[in-house]
UniProtKB/Swiss-Prot annotation:
Pathway: Cofactor biosynthesis; coenzyme F420 biosynthesis. GO terms for biological process: F420-0 metabolic process. It comes from the Bacteria. The lineage of its organism: Bacteria, Bacillati, Actinomycetota, Actinomycetes, Kitasatosporales. GO terms for molecular function: GTP binding; phospholactate guanylyltransferase activity. Guanylyltransferase that catalyzes the activation of phosphoenolpyruvate (PEP) as enolpyruvoyl-2-diphospho-5'-guanosine, via the condensation of PEP with GTP. It is involved in the biosynthesis of coenzyme F420, a hydride carrier cofactor. Transmembrane segments: none annotated. It catalyses: phosphoenolpyruvate + GTP + H(+) = enolpyruvoyl-2-diphospho-5'-guanosine + diphosphate. InterPro entries: CofC (IPR002835), Nucleotide-diphossugar_trans (IPR029044). SUPFAM superfamilies: Nucleotide-diphospho-sugar transferases. This is Phosphoenolpyruvate guanylyltransferase.
């Protein structure tokens, strides 16, 4: 079974404001783009993934991610993250109604295709499932079987909200790269310790990060 992934990408100029203590205003847009590029490249390299649709209104992000092989869906609702994901899921469902769909965070720069494949294989057992983030508070992946509604509830406390909505929490070991999203300098250090993709590594080399 091959999946269609929906990856939301925020306008780069407004992305990753919580990394302000690690990357200045001039570097953060490039860092956010690098996260998305490494995430999408790893996802497309996963044998369980048929295609990736990026939902964004950022012209630069759309252009760079399309160059990697992703499809680009305009963020037409303009209603925030969950609206963008619901819209993206509807678009890909219209094109591939028989395909399972997963919403994947765009800030997983250490993502490993084999670990993503393990998570998606586990998710096939359930109509709707999710993977919590490394902090145990948020969500990095939400999956739905064909014919099921995505019903994303990303944002603050999304782990609890997805669980309350009936999605099954996936409890897997050795999938750290799929759980390690990056919102803070500490998150970035954790991702670097796992081993990030080449684009993130290149941008991160320009940052002064304690302990690196």
């Amino acid at each position: 079974m091959q999946w269609t992934l929906v990856v939301p990408v925020k306008a780069l100029a407004r992305a990753k404001s919580r990394l302000s203590d690690t990357a200045d205003d001039g570097l953060r847009p490039g860092l956010a783009l690098a996260f998305a590029q490494d995430t999408v490249a790893a996802a497309l390299a996963c044998p369980a993934v048929a295609d990736v649709a990026v939902v964004t209104d950022d012209a630069r992000a759309g252009r760079e991610l399309a160059a990697l092989g992703a499809g680009v869906v305009a963020d037409e609702p303009g209603g925030g993250l969950n609206a963008a994901l619901a819209h993206g899921a509807a678009v890909v469902r219209a094109a591939r109604p028989e395909s399972p769909v997963a919403a994947l965070n765009a800030d997983l720069p250490a993502l490993r295709p084999a670990e993503l494949a393990r998570v998606l294989a586990a998710a096939t057992q359930f109509p709707r499932a999710f993977l919590p983030d490394a902090a145990g508070i948020g969500t990095t992946l939400l999956t739905v079987a064909p014919g099921q509604e995505l019903a994303p509830a990303f944002g603050a406390d999304s782990r609890a909200r997805h669980r309350a909505s009936g999605a099954v929490e996936l409890r897997l070991d050795a999938v750290d790269s799929v759980r390690q999203d990056v919102d803070t300098g500490g998150d970035l250090r954790s991702a670097l310790a796992l081993g990030v993709g080449p684009r993130t590594a290149a941008v991160a080399a320009r940052l002064l990060i304690a302990g690196q």
